[in-house]
């Protein structure tokens, strides 16, 4: 990244995004932070995002937007909970106090309010506040990215798409990072099933910058949702050198690559990608995206009857420290997969009991408000499935299958729960569940024709119960 490309105080003001600091260095470091966030790539020449934020704080400790970016990125990463992490909670308080001690723009005050609101767990209101910023400042990348990620956690697919659609015309080709905004739009199109348009927009973004890993990610998703394995595998292999340097997303793109192999039934190839890329990057970063990818990959392989050895216990070294976080139900379910896979009954019990305790007084925390009708039934379903109580697992999951969207994540990520439900129904001794399995598989085959995984499940369903792990 060339320092000359980074905006100083006047450039931010000219863009209609005035920053309350007199330091040109701080303004450029803030721009560098946003650039790395948008491109999913830490620039080592700048010290990465953490290095930029640290230098901002050292240069102008009263620069509120520096605190907004630092706290917002921690919170949006969902790897730390201000409810249990006192250092993070204090950092949010410091930001709030600073915002009251100086004259800020309305836009900056809304940013502070949005981060405070997200910290309190009120994700829908936080998204609304970021949208208020975008109504008057459509090129505010921090507000756009935070809203985009927030909608992703909420399972609000249309909002995730439309939030970008409303501002995209304001991002001219000469606007810094405009092609990456187009990549964000491609993902929203994908998640609302506009696959052809998603591919078109993603490829337009990649024509500008072939290292745009988020647009690569969109293309990977489209091939996954269409079960177009040959195209997906070819695309991954042909573009790997372009995106593998995106240290914040490469693990997830490798996860998508491994999904193609699981779909094909080539489990050794999937395990090789796991051992060579997915696991090492997770242990290096510890980020939640990488953690849930690891849990999901091992669980999917286990569903296919693959012995994953000690890999669960290795992953537990990371997940166990997050048992009390309860930032997202989506995360909690993946922590649970790791405790079940490791046969750690104490962690399973602690995770579920602490979740249920929070459901008693959720307050404004949107995720805690979902525990009783989504979090607890899904946790119980995974536990019952693990115990071989397939009928109970199916009965817990089937009534809420269309509500599972509310835990967030992508269609590809949540498909794991579809697979668990189908396998539970197949393996149940109940004729009702076996018939349900046939119905669900017919539905799946219609939606994703030519899926080898679906065909394997159809054959197992025809063979009768008792043949799944």
UniProtKB/Swiss-Prot annotation:
InterPro entries: TPR-like_helical_dom_sf, TTC38. The keyword Thylakoid does not apply. Keywords: Repeat, TPR repeat. The keyword Cytoplasm does not apply. Signal peptide: none annotated. SUPFAM superfamilies: TPR-like (SSF48452). TPR repeats lie at residues 107-140, 179-212, 251-284. Belongs to the TTC38 family. This is Tetratricopeptide repeat protein 38. It comes from Xenopus tropicalis (Western clawed frog). The gene is ttc38.
């Amino acid at each position: 990244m060339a320092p000359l490309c980074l905006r100083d105080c006047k450039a931010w003001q000219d863009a209609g995004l005035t920053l309350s600091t007199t330091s040109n260095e701080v303004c450029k470091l803030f721009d560098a932070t946003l650039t790395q966030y948008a491109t999913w790539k830490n620039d080592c020449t700048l010290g990465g995002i953490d290095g930029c934020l640290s230098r901002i704080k050292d240069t102008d400790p009263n620069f509120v937007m520096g605190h907004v970016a630092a706290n917002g990125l921690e919170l949006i990463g969902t790897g730390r909970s201000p409810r249990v992490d006192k250092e993070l909670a204090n950092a949010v308080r410091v930001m709030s106090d600073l915002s009251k001690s100086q004259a800020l723009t309305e836009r900056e005050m809304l940013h502070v309010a949005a981060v405070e609101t997200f910290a309190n767990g009120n994700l829908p209101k936080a998204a609304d506040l970021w949208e208020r910023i975008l109504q008057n400042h459509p090129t505010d990348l921090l507000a756009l990215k935070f809203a985009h990620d927030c909608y992703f956690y909420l399972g609000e697919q249309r909002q995730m798409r439309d939030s970008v659609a409303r501002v995209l015309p304001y991002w001219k080709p000469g606007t810094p990072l405009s092609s990456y905004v187009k990549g964000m739009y491609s993902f929203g199109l994908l998640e609302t099933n506009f696959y052809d348009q998603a591919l078109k927009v993603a490829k337009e973004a990649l024509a500008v910058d072939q290292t745009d890993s988020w647009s690569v990610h969109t293309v990977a998703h489209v091939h996954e949702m269409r079960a177009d394995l040959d195209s997906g595998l070819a695309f991954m292999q042909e573009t790997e050198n372009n995106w593998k340097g995106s240290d914040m997303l490469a693990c997830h793109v490798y996860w998508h690559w491994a999904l193609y192999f699981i779909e094909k039934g080539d489990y050794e190839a999937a395990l090789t990608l796991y051992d060579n890329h997915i696991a090492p990057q997770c242990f290096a970063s510890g980020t939640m995206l990488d953690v849930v990818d690891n849990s999901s990959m091992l669980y999917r392989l286990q569903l296919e009857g693959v012995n994953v050895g000690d890999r669960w216990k290795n992953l537990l070294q990371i997940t166990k420290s997050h048992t009390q976080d309860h930032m997202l139900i989506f995360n909690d379910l993946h922590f649970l997969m790791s405790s079940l896979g490791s046969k750690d009954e104490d962690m399973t019990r602690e995770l579920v009991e602490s979740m249920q305790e929070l459901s008693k007084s959720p307050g404004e925390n949107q995720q805690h408000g979902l525990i009783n009708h989504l979090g607890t039934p899904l946790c119980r379903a995974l536990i019952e499935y693990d115990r071989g109580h397939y009928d109970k697992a199916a009965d817990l999951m089937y009534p809420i299958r269309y509500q599972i969207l509310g835990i967030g994540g992508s269609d590809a990520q949540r498909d794991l729960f579809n697979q668990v439900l189908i396998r539970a129904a197949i393996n149940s001794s109940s004729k009702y569940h076996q018939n349900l399995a046939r119905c669900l598989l017919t539905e799946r085959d219609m939606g994703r024709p030519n899926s080898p995984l679906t065909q394997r499940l159809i054959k197992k369903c025809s063979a009768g119960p008792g043949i799944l792990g």
